Amino acid sequence: MNFKPRWLATGIGSLPVLDPEEAVSLILEYLPEIPIWPQLPQRGPVEGMVWQYSEGMPRIRSDVKSNKIWIDAAGDLTPELERFYEHFFAGNAEYFALSREFAPGYYAMVNRLKSALPKEIRVLKGHITG
């Protein structure tokens, strides 16, 4: 790959808008060479990066009403860990996919790019929580 960014603009992901389609339009207008997929935390806690990556993880519990997320270490961890690793070792990537409920901005961007990939795009930027 012969990509030389040369000070091209990109973003961190979070945008202060509620509508996923509006977010995608703003991103493609202002970050045309290195667009991000939008996270829209003003829509609610599940749009936050920690919440998005907690979905499907063993022993992670959450309560949207109180905006809390935690690890439940009580009881036998084995069944949830087995289920998690069965999917992992089977290569079942769909099990680990972001859901439309937790990441509508991601799906809005994917759908827009599938319908018409702008020629200005050099790289797509994603985000992970580590």
Cite the ranges covered by each PLM segment.
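Alpha/beta catalytic barrel-like cores
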Residues: 1-124
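Active-site-proximal loop/short-helix segments
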Residues: 125-130
